[in-house]
Amino acid sequence: MANLFQELYHKDLKRIYKTFKTSGGSVILDNVIGDIPDLQSYFENIKREINPDTKILIAYHNSAWEPFLTLATKLGLRKKVGVQNWLDQEDLRNILILSGFEVISSQRRFFGITVITVAKPQIANYKLQTGSESQYSVSIMIPARNEEQNVSKIIPSIPRFGKWQEIIFVEGNSTDRTWSAITNLKFLISKQTSNFNEQKFKRVVKAYQQTGKGKADAVRLGFAKATGDILMIYDADRTVPASDLPKFYNALASGIGEFANGSRLVYPMEGQAMQTLNKLGNQFFSEVFTRIFGQHFKDTLCGTKALWRSDFLKMKRDYLKYLRVDPFGDFALIFSAVKHNLKVIEIPVRYKEREYGSTNIKRFYHGLLLAKLAYIAFKEFKL
């Protein structure tokens, strides 16, 4: 009985494979993507090993079957498996695009357990061919409030990417020693600057204290002080791994997107990284904003984002206008990016539990605020 669903899966798989023929060779990935911790890196590695005319056929479980397959496992009708990636077709399409593939088709039966996606390598775009993906400077804004024990761990965890990096801490209204931790870190990094220069990589740390309140005000100040070609936001709570930041950089440098928005709702989360009610609310409002904006948003509340500084300067007036009703600043950026027709690309990231401190989100208050922002967006973009 434990193999019942596996038998159904393979029967469905055989029926669908009959409809596909490929020339130039193919690579078949049969139900493996559920176990891969970083699918973007996985597909990038595959791309490096195959010929340009090779097609990849990806077979995986339809995400609509997740609750049924989970129940089947509990009832002993399906073999036990570890925590799985449950991707819908848009999730996989987005990851393939980020990895340098072009999606040819995606098929599933109405009641089918199996989804088949066919993709091929994209022709390398001009920016990547000329090696310019490492020629842009980066300013990383890090708003920090009550993050004393996280601050010292941030910079060592940020990979070296880009022409040079400018890391901008903005602290405000902390009740612990966050500001002291930032200034101590800045001093230590300044002593190491000569070593970075010897290795032909420049990393500068700046620190400011905001006079206003809230994350949105902190990011606004950081953007005003930034000088890099690409602007990034990275939350000091470290719930998103800093090792994912190069993915945001590469998405812009390669021309795949113009506004890179993190998404924590693709991969499984760690423990109680996001409470169930918060997750459901995020999913609901993401669907609402997707319909309003006409561009796909899986996670509107992820704090990790990236955009070109030149684009930010063009949309700055709208950004400051929307900032008046958005204490976090995420929607002010999203509204402005959509209004200025920037191409949004989502970057799937892992979401971890906090190691220190507590969230600044007030569930019901900010839920009402999201409803207000959705109403403002509807009036702005639909009426």
Go through the PLM ranges and name each one:
Residues 6, 10, 56, 112-118, ...:
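Hydrophobic helical membrane-anchoring modules
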Residues 35, 177, 234-251:
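Acidic donor-binding/catalytic loop of UDP-sugar-dependent glycosyltransferases
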Residues 40-55:
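A short glycine-rich, Lys/Arg-flanked "PGG" loop and its adjoining helix->strand segment in the class I
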Residues 65-75, 204, 210-225, 242-323, ...:
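Acceptor/aglycone-binding surface of glycosyltransferases and processive sugar-polymer synthases
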Residues 74-91:
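Acceptor-substrate binding/catalytic loop of class I
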Residues 171-180:
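A conserved acidic beta->alpha catalytic loop
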Residues 179-225:
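Conserved donor nucleotide-binding strand/loop of the catalytic core
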Residues 231:
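Short aromatic/hydrophobic "clamp" motif used to bind/position activated sugar donors
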